Amino acid sequence: MKRIYKNTILSMAVFLPVLSQAQLVKMPMDVAQDGTTYEQVSMKSFKVNGALAPYCVPGAKGKAWRLDGYSSYLQAQIDPTVLAGKKQLTFSLWVAPESYPMMKLDQDGEWFTTMLGNVKLDDNNTISGDKGFAFQLGSRGSYKFICYVAGWQVKCEPEAKLSRYQWNHLVATVDGVNRKVTLYNNGESVASKTCTKGEITPGGSTLYVGKSYVEDKVDVFYLNTYNGLLDDFEIYDGIRTDVLKEKAENAPVLTYSPERYAGDILRPSFHGMPTAGWTNETHGATYYNGKYHVFFQKNPNGPYMSRLNWGHIVSDNLYKWEEDPTAISPEEWYDKKGCWSGCVFTD
């Protein structure tokens, strides 16, 4: 009995370090009030950027960081040497967008914003260099995972759009041994591509979180930033299919607490409005299923007169209002400017 017990303890002692070594990068998105966050394997700390204090909510795993769509982003540092020489890696990221990114109205096509990655991509996907990885989200809702194997680019591009207002657990397995790159969303394979055999090309040390590496702005406001929740980012050595089974601990909360803007003298203290973002032209008041509904122009990404959504607030009594998910959002090529005005009919 003692021998069995001793062997069990020894086995655990050997097994536990193997598990810890298999995790090469771990970045929880639990940001302190002073803007500090950590990469937990190296224990390096970084400061997030933003016009206001960072905002966190209960996340898929622990706390999640709420990015505002116009000013929030992070440039962290990872050690690319821990990825060097690897032929099999697993990348994992939790995302819950409120809206799709902005784009310039004088240009066609879909613009892409880096949710997280170290590939130097601009908004039109022009690439500087031939190395690195990135999870990207487009202005029409397309999403993709990009990586390099033996210096050759591989793109996994699902046909469906990335769901808003819900957790998307994005997992990419890059297998340079069996020549396959697969992207999963919430445990289901959504795209797969053949790659060349060889080592994964790790890219540089700068990790772009919530913004592409280029500086695209209108005045002081970024155009290529992400609006929504980000939670744990991890890179594992090897192909880790067990990661696909992970479930979110909490539903995503994309509204802001009223306390966030309590000191804003330009914000009405008694007025039905969204919890954040740009709003204008309230229309379409109606009573339906026991609640009052009001619709309005809303730009969840920030103070932009383009890519407008059709916002939605509801009330039981006409003085206390809560925000619902946007009713209509620009997603197709003809929706460049978004939803400008309208009305509501009940049938």
Specify the residue positions occupied by each region the protein language model found.
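Flexible glycan-contacting loops in extracellular carbohydrate-active proteins
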Residues: 60, 193-229
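Beta-strand-rich interaction surfaces with strong enrichment in secreted/lumenal proteins
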Residues: 78-81, 157-161, 196-197
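Short, aromatic/His-centered strand-loop micro-motif at the edge of beta-sheets
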Residues: 145-169
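Carbohydrate-active catalytic/glycan-binding domains of CAZyme proteins
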Residues: 232-234, 239-347
